[in-house]
């Protein structure tokens, strides 16, 4: 009978899958173990909510078809996919060893990381397999875009496979994935994200995966990405403004890093070069001296799988076996339960979809579904509301010598604004707008004052910055840095009434950056 069941095609009938424990979750999806009765095999099902995606199913199916043609021992096998109500179910191979992140957390929880989380041989063995998978993807025109320990899975035999590519990224871009080799979509996890992906200026290619690979190497040694303690906006600012991170970045106890040698550190520094052209390819990295330390899968089986958490230890039990309807959501105590009610806006899943961080003044913003959640499809054009565009300054050629005063809608008194913000600003009830002025030079090198309002609980720093760029007031390269400093002010208005910061767009020709004269710099203040 086993031979007969293995010859059967994978079912696209929801009733043929018995959903079991939750084995992973993110902002937009839940992964559950499941038993496929016709195949007599346990699988993993990734359930992605399509309700807010508005992606063309024709385009989506084309991408799934391309993904299903990926066959490589270091890429998780996708068996089939189908739609259940407002969810896309991806059926894939279940790797019982879990993710490398599961193992990292397990080691740290047991206090066995004082001299580094994983040793060099283990890291080299895991990462060599990851490189094999990345080389395959890159040769086939695919960019993974979210390489990290949480997306590196282990089989019970010590095999290593990369998961979570293709459709996940496809959904996050609103269906705007083409077969071009350069992307401009903003997808990925901030701590692992390459600078060129953050900037959204030149576009990026497969070298973005190499940066993420370097961050992952640090994660396997230290237990976390370098800037993991910081909020997303701060991560973006640190990545763009600072020198590339190293093994030591953010690590307080340097003793834990003593056992890591020069070849490992050199490999990391090669990956973490801000200029993507200087980074090696996956094929070139495979020839690096560090990977001579790599061993076989039996080594991983013996070295880490025997002390890894079991699938039952990793799992989050579902409180009620679901029927054909209902929603899965996380409860306050971290458990999972099914609800037959309409979308629960108070659940974690609901919050992700409702997107509390979204700016209503921007109809559809280009964003990262994890970093800047929105309820609209991603990758569509921005539209500036009439009430704002009516107050925009004149074109650059008509700018006066003195800073242009751009008067936006009436503002609240600064004192009241600061008081409101310091006493619980972010609540939906407290919608007192904060008046701000952004002073920077235009393309004619003339100072320009841009006045606008920010309403806590309604606006987001990223959304407002997008409006300024859409209106032609701010260079697109400065999106992240303007948003980061706006966030800094609205979070702590009393201590940050005015900030001066360096622009990512830099200066032209022979100009010398000057923070006093705002050459290559900008100033953001509460007015």
From Swiss-Prot:
Its cofactor is Mg(2+). The gene is OXSR1. Phosphorylation at Thr-185 by WNK kinases (WNK1, WNK2, WNK3 or WNK4) is required for activation. Autophosphorylated; promoting its activity. The modification N-acetylserine is found at residue 2. Residues 334-348 have a biased composition (Acidic residues). The keyword Protein biosynthesis does not apply. Its EC number is 2.7.11.1. Residues 399-408 have a biased composition (Polar residues). GO terms for biological process: cell volume homeostasis; cellular hyperosmotic response; cellular hypotonic response; chemokine (C-C motif) ligand 21 signaling pathway; chemokine (C-X-C motif) ligand 12 signaling pathway; intracellular signal transduction; negative regulation of potassium ion transmembrane transport; osmosensory signaling pathway. SMART domains: S_TKc (SM00220). It comes from the Eukaryota. Keywords: Acetylation, ATP-binding, Cytoplasm, Kinase, Magnesium, Metal-binding, Nucleotide-binding, Phosphoprotein, Serine/threonine-protein kinase, Transferase. PANTHER family: SERINE_THREONINE-PROTEIN KINASE OSR1, STERILE20-LIKE KINASE, ISOFORM B-RELATED. One of its GO terms (cellular component) is cytosol. The modification Phosphoserine is found at residues 324-325, 339, 347, 359, 427. The active site is at residue 146. Residues 315-360, 392-427 are annotated as: Disordered. It is found in: Cytoplasm. InterPro entries: Kinase-like_dom_sf, Kinase_OSR1/WNK_CCT, Prot_kinase_dom, Protein_kinase_ATP_BS, STE20/SPS1-PAK. This is Serine/threonine-protein kinase OSR1. SUPFAM superfamilies: Protein kinase-like (PK-like).
């Amino acid at each position: 009978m086993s031979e007969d069941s293995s010859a059967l095609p994978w079912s696209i009938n929801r009733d043929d899958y018995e959903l079991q424990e939750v084995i992973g979750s993110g902002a937009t999806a839940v992964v559950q173990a499941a038993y496929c009765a016709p195949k007599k095999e346990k699988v993993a099902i990734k359930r992605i909510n399509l309700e807010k995606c508005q992606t063309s199913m024709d385009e989506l199916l084309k991408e799934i078809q391309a993904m299903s043609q990926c066959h490589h021992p270091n890429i998780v096998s996708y068996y089939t996919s189908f739609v259940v109500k407002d969810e896309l179910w991806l059926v894939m191979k279940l790797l019982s060893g879990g993710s490398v992140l599961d193992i990292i957390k397990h080691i740290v929880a047991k206090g066995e990381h004082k001299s580094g989380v994983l040793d060099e041989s283990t890291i080299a063995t895991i990462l060599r397999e990851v490189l094999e998978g990345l080389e395959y993807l890159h040769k086939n025109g695919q960019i993974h875009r979210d390489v990290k320990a949480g997306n590196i899975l282990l089989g019970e035999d010590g095999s290593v496979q990369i998961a979570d590519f293709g459709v996940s990224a496809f959904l996050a871009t609103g269906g705007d994935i083409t077969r071009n080799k350069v992307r401009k979509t903003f997808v990925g996890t901030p701590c692992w994200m390459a600078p060129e992906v953050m900037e959204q200026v030149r576009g990026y290619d497969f070298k973005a995966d190499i940066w993420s690979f370097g961050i992952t190497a640090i994660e396997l040694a230290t237990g976390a990405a370098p800037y993991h303690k910081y909020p997303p906006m701060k991560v973006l600012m640190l990545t763009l403004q600072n020198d590339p991170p190293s093994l030591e970045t953010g690590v307080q106890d340097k003793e834990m890093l003593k056992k890591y040698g020069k070849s490992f550190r050199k490999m990391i520094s090669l990956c973490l070069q801000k200029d993507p052209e200087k980074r090696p390819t996956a094929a070139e990295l495979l020839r690096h001296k560090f990977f001579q330390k790599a061993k076989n899968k039996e080594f991983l089986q013996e070295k880490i799988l025997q002390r890894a958490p079991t699938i039952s230890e990793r799992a989050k039990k579902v409180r009620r076996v679901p029927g054909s309807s209902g929603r899965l959501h996380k409860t306050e105590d971290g458990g999972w339960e099914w609800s037959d009610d309409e979308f629960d806006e108070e659940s974690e899943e609901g919050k992700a979809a409702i997107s509390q961080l979204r700016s209503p003044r921007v109809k559809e913003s280009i964003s990262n579904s994890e970093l800047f959640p929105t309820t609209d499809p991603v990758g569509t054009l921005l539209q500036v509301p009439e009430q704002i565009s009516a107050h925009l300054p004149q074109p650059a050629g008509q700018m006066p010598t003195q800073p242009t005063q751009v008067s936006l809608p009436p503002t609240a008194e600064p004192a009241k604004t600061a008081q409101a913000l310091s006493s619980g600003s972010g609540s939906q009830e407290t919608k007192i707008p904060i008046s701000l002025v952004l002073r920077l030079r235009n393309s004619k090198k003339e100072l320009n004052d841009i006045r606008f309002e920010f309403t806590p609980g309604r606006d987001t720093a990223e959304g407002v910055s997008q409006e300024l760029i859409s209106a032609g007031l701010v260079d697109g390269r400065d999106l992240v840095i303007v948003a980061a400093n706006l966030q800094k002010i609205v979070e702590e208005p009393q201590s940050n009434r005015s900030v001066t910061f360096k622009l990512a767009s830099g200066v032209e020709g022979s100009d010398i950056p000057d923070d006093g004269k705002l050459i290559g710099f900008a100033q953001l203040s509460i007015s």
